């Protein structure tokens, strides 16, 4: 039996970054994107999901199946400066919102 198992990795604890965190709004901690389960102020210890399908704000002409990144909590095209890879859209963008698969 493996003795080095830590967890399933589906959730991770993190410290809320500058500006805090809002439940359901993607947060990038270096290259790790998390979806916070609850909100908190800068410095608060929180828990976020590392995968799953999420409905979040989006910007640009994004289409289902397209790779997307996240910048300041909003899905953007992968080539957007200072963005972090998020995953792939599972819906077209409608009214600046899209459903996307968070792929670690």
Give short role names for the model-derived ranges.
Residues 1-104:
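Surface-exposed, low-hydrophobicity beta-strand/loop segments enriched in small/polar/acidic residues
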């Amino acid at each position: 039996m493996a003795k080095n198992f830590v967890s399933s990795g589906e959730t991770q604890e993190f410290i809320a970054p500058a500006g805090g965190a809002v439940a359901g709004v993607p947060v990038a901690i270096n290259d790790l994107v998390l979806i916070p389960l609850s909100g908190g102020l800068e410095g608060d210890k929180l828990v976020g999901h590392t995968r799953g399908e999420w409905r979040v704000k989006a910007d640009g002409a994004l289409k289902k199946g397209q790779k997307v990144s996240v910048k300041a909590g909003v899905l953007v095209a992968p080539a957007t400066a200072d963005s972090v890879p998020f995953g792939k859209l599972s819906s077209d963008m409608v009214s600046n919102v899209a459903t996307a698969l968070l792929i670690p």
